[in-house]
């Protein structure tokens, strides 16, 4: 039997499918998620149910978003899960997670995310951060390092700034390739994202912050002065106390927000 087949399902490369099979890792992730009935529990990419089954055991209802029609069909006929699941068949990148919110109940979102869409999916989920209590995701280890990086690190970039603007980022555990079927070619890790109820550095317009970060990190080896010359002048960098000869990975989240707010003020 092919090592891409697990529980009768062949992993689909185009969906980035790698199924978690290590019981100890599963237990640790479920413990970190801490499922309960006081939140709207949401799983992205339930796959063959490695996390779905133990989480569903602990709650009355679990909402799942799954793209693969074959896996959706399996979930609809699952002898235990079918009565507890609310299943949305579709692309999580296009899904309106806001429709799942219930007055007085924030979401706990989790999943073993397809590595080929993890970064754009993070950006999509940040749009719903105010309705989310916690997020726990299995990701490529490299992505977790980027999420949790500090200024000056090679991994520090646009994803770092936006993630840490919206959330406290906490790496939970590292997961080796042999914990999956088929085994991915990269190491994996679980991360906890805790959206801020009150942001430490409020931005006047997140769209401006996002654009500024994209522009700054577009050419990482060039200076801020070079990359942002159409957005901020040398005098404005000086007003902010930011050395414009620095490279984008040397600038803190607080400083990126300050730059974005100055751009907003100029537009007003």
Swiss-Prot record:
Location(s) in or outside the cell: Cytoplasm
Gene3D superfamilies (UniProt xref): Ribosomal RNA adenine dimethylase-like, domain 2, Vaccinia Virus protein VP39
Stored InterPro entries: KsgA/Erm, rRNA_Ade_diMease-like_C, rRNA_Ade_Mease_Trfase_CS, rRNA_Ade_methylase_Trfase_N, rRNA_adenine_dimethylase, SAM-dependent_MTases_sf
Class of this enzyme: transferase
Positions annotated to bind S-adenosyl-L-methionine: 18, 20, 45, 66, 91, 112
One Gene Ontology MF term: 16S rRNA (adenine(1518)-N(6)/adenine(1519)-N(6))-dimethyltransferase activity
UniProt-listed SUPFAM superfamilies: S-adenosyl-L-methionine-dependent methyltransferases
The reaction(s) this protein catalyses: adenosine(1518)/adenosine(1519) in 16S rRNA + 4 S-adenosyl-L-methionine = N(6)-dimethyladenosine(1518)/N(6)-dimethyladenosine(1519) in 16S rRNA + 4 S-adenosyl-L-homocysteine + 4 H(+)
Entry GO CC: cytosol
UniProt entry keywords in alphabetical sequence: Cytoplasm, Methyltransferase, RNA-binding, rRNA processing, S-adenosyl-L-methionine, Transferase
EC number: 2.1.1.182
Domain of life: Bacteria
Keyword S-adenosyl-L-methionine belongs to the record: yes
Function: Specifically dimethylates two adjacent adenosines (A1518 and A1519) in the loop of a conserved hairpin near the 3'-end of 16S rRNA in the 30S particle. May play a critical role in biogenesis of 30S subunits.
Family (UniProt): Belongs to the class I-like SAM-binding methyltransferase superfamily. rRNA adenine N(6)-methyltransferase family. RsmA subfamily.
Entry-linked HAMAP family: 16SrRNA_methyltr_A
Official protein name in the record: Ribosomal RNA small subunit methyltransferase A
The species this protein was found in: Shewanella baltica (strain OS155 / ATCC BAA-1091)
């Amino acid at each position: 039997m092919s090592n891409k087949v697990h529980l009768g399902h062949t992993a689909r490369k185009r969906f980035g499918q790698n199924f978690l099979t290590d019981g100890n890792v599963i237990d640790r992730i479920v413990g970190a998620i801490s499922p309960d009935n006081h939140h709207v529990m949401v799983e992205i990419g339930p796959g063959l149910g490695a996390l779905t089954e133990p989480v569903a055991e602990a709650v009355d209802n679990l909402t799942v978003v799954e793209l693969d029609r074959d896996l959706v069909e399996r979930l609809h006929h699952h002898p235990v899960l079918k009565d507890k699941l609310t299943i949305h068949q579709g692309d999580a990148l296009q899904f309106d997670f806001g429709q799942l919110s219930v007055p007085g109940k924030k979401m706990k979102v989790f999943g073993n995310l397809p590595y080929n869409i993890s970064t754009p999916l993070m950006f999509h989920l940040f749009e719903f951060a105010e309705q989310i209590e916690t997020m726990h995701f299995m990701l490529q280890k490299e992505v977790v390092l980027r999420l949790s990086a500090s200024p000056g690190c090679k991994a520090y970039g646009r994803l770092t700034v936006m993630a840490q603007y919206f959330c406290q980022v906490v790496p939970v555990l590292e997961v080796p390739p042999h914990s999956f079927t088929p085994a991915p070619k990269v190491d994996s890790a679980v991360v906890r994202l805790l959206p801020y109820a009150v942001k430490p550095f409020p931005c006047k317009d997140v769209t401006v912050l996002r654009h500024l970060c994209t522009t700054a990190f577009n050419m990482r080896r060039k200076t801020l002065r070079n990359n942002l010359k159409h957005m901020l002048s040398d005098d404005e960098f000086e007003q902010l106390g930011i050395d414009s000869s620095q490279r984008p990975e040397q600038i803190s989240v607080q400083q990126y927000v300050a730059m974005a707010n100055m751009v907003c003020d100029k537009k007003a």
